[in-house]
Amino acid sequence: MGTMRSVYLIIIIILFFAFISLSFGEIYEYRGVVFYPNGSQTVDVSKLHIDYENPDAFSIYISYRNSSFYLPYSKNITLNLPPKKFNISITISASRISRDEWRVYYKIINNYPYSILFNISFPGGFNIKNASVLVPAKSYKIITLSKIQNSNILYFGDSNISFEVPAKLMIRYSLPIPFSIIKSNKILSNGSIEWTAIYIIKNDKNVSLNVNASYWAVVNNTKIDFGNYSYIIEPNENVSQSFNITSDYVPIFYLKFYAWRDVYETIKIKPAIKVDNSYIIGIGKVEGLSFNIPYYNYMEREIKKKKEEKENEESSKTINQMQRHKKEEKSQTQETKKPSKNEMNKQEKERKYPLIIEEKFKKVAAAIATVTTTSITAMLIPPIFRRRSYIVDKGIFSIKDLELLSGTVYVPEGCKLGNILPGGITIIKLTDVEKDLARDLHEIYDIPLNSAKAIILGVKYGGRVFLSDKKAYDVAVEIGLEAYLF
């Protein structure tokens, strides 16, 4: 052949995986959901919608929620997902403030590790039509609505709620890029022919790519492997690799490679309402319910009477009140006569329905409605509370405090304890229901959480309740507790 050089240029377009951010349209998941006022929900469908059109893209891989999808080419598509509930719950409760006024408490609980903005459209007839509320992570918010209606039955209709939950999705997809193989030869001194192949892979995109490449040649039907290589090719750069073989036959050089980039997109999960056979995306349904709370006239008279008596009494110091009650307690222990059935019924009625209050104290109604429906109906007193008890909302006491608290002192869990403590102090652990009630009182009426816990214990078990917060003291008095401010 002599000293000759042949140069062959082969340009081949192959499939590869690369990323271009502007290729993606909107991607979101929607769930057909119905929330119920008891905190439950049903989700009938979960779907992933991809609004994606790019004529150059193909071989798209999507990984989301332990599911993988392959799209041979770009298109708008909706993919089915396993139904999954939201980490959100909604509870609705109500109380009757007076003969003509109701209160509804719309509680949104966010169990996600991030804050979520909720937009709610309420049924007609209430003082609030629409509301927006940002609920912090692992927390809740209560929206209080009111309605003027003189009826024992209140119907709170269906409401709509909208929100967006962030989520992560992984995408890997393909575009064409060029590569080239330059082949040449030369005659060696021994008369043999040496063939050289120079491979060039070019990244003509504006992002870096991961590349795996395999090189080989076929000579006289025999395959010769040059090896497998991995690269990271930066934008608008290329990699080259050269290999030599000696053969009197003309070799054919081959290259197989793929390049990819994994992209993690932030998408939104939205609720959806089913209408006929389709869904309205972005809105979820919250089912309504009816409340039946009778109004008792005698309760209004009793509360007014107590209020007038309280206003006519001269204020006295806590220590004087305690001395008076100590004498009463001593005389009660000497009496063997049990209270009559009428007296027991009267006490039960007063504790069961402390709901109708004066206009000045309407703010107490929500707490009373919640407590009466959850705790007051359980009137069996555990052994530790069968004697006259002292319930306090703190664990740090002064010498003067200890003089007032001559018996066993019960402190709700969560109170910080000081160095000086009563001799018979007992820490009381609240149930989950009682903790929820205390949190509701704390948030709705802006009173200390430990004071709210003490009020809950006082309502449930009876006894004297000592409170260190004036606002909490006012709430306890209006509920009907034997409360003291200290």
UniProtKB/Swiss-Prot annotation:
Protein name: Uncharacterized protein MJ1397
Composition-biased stretches (Basic and acidic residues): 306-316, 326-349
Keywords assigned: Signal
Source domain of life: Archaea
Region Disordered, annotated ranges: 306-349
Listed PROSITE patterns: LIPOYL (PS00189)
Signal peptide bounds: 1-25
Organism (species): Methanocaldococcus jannaschii (strain ATCC 43067 / DSM 2661 / JAL-1 / JCM 10045 / NBRC 100440)
